[in-house]
Design a protein with these regions (language model features):
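Adenosine-nucleotide cofactor-binding segment
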Residues: 184-193
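N-terminal Rossmann-fold NAD(P) dinucleotide-binding loop
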Residues: 176-177
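Residues that mark the start of a beta-strand
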Residues: 17, 48-50, 165
C-alpha cells in the first residue's frame, strides 16, 4: 500500500511515510543507508498538527547528523524517522494559532506528512510576505535557517557594520553565500574563499 499523509492504513490507523536512516554511511551516503517506511499517524492530541509536506530541505549539516558523533546537532537515530526543515500545509489542528490551510515551516521533514508537535518548532509563514511574492520555499533557505544563521552571525555575533571589511570562508556555501549577500547589501567589503 502506498500511503499518503492522513491516509487510513491497516486497522483504521492513519499512516504517513517517512525516511529512516538504516545504517551509518561510510563516506558518501547511498540509498542502502535509507528506507522509506510507513509510520502511524494517529489521532491528534493537544498542541499537535496534522500536516502535508510540500517541500523538504536537504542541508549540508544533515550529513554530519548521519554519524554517531557529538556535534552541535543531535545525530539521527538508526531506524527512526529523520528530521529536517520542511514547508507543510496544516490539514488538521489542535494547536493554538494554527488552522487548516496554513503554510508552516517546521523541523519534522523527511516525510510526506503526519503529526507534529511543538518539538518540531512549527512557525506559520507570514502571509504578507507570501502575498508580496516570496515563495514558500524561500523560508527553507534565505528566510529560514540558512539566512537566519547568516544574519545572526554577521550582524549580532560579529557586529559588522557598513564600511567594515569582512572575510567569509566557504563563501560559496549556503550560509557563506547568504553572509556575502547581506554584507554587500549593507555596504561592507567582502573577501571570500
Amino acid at each position: 500500500m502506498v500511503a499518503v499523509a492522513g491516509e487510513i492504513g491497516k486497522g483504521g490507523i492513519p499512516m504517513a511515510k517517512a525516511w529512516h536512516l538504516t545504517s551509518r554511511p561510510q563516506g558518501l551516503p547511498t540509498i542502502d543507508n535509507f528506507a522509506l517506511r510507513e509510520v502511524p499517524d494517529g489521532p491528534l492530541e493537544k498542541d499537535q498538527l496534522r500536516i502535508r509536506n510540500l517541500w523538504l530541505s536537504v542541508d549540508p549539516y544533515m550529513r554530519g547528523r548521519m554519524n554517531d558523533a557529538k556535534s552541535y546537532a543531535a545525530s539521527f537515530q538508526i531506524d527512526q524517522p529523520m528530521t529536517g526543515g520542511a514547508i507543510g500545509e496544516v490539514i488538521e489542528s489542535r494547536m493554538e494559532g494554527f488552522a487548516p490551510g496554513d503554510l508552516i515551516l517546521h523541523m519534522g521533514g523527511w516525510r510526506d506528512g503526519g503529526v507534529i508537535g511543538l518539538d518540531m518548532m512549527p512557525n506559520k509563514l507570514p502571509g504578507d510576505m507570501l502575498a508580496a511574492g516570496l515563495t514558500p520555499q524561500t523560508f527553507l533557505h534565505n528566510m529560514g535557517l540558512t539566512g537566519g544563521t547568516a544574519w545572526i552571525g554577521l550582524l549580532r555575533v560579529a557586529a559588522a557594520k557598513p564600511g567594515d571589511t569582512i572575510f567569509v570562508s566557504a563563501a560559496a556555501g549556503a550560509v557563506g553565500s547568504a553572509v556575502v549577500q547581506i554584507a554587500k547589501a549593507r555596504e561592507m567589503t567582502v573577501i571570500g574563499s
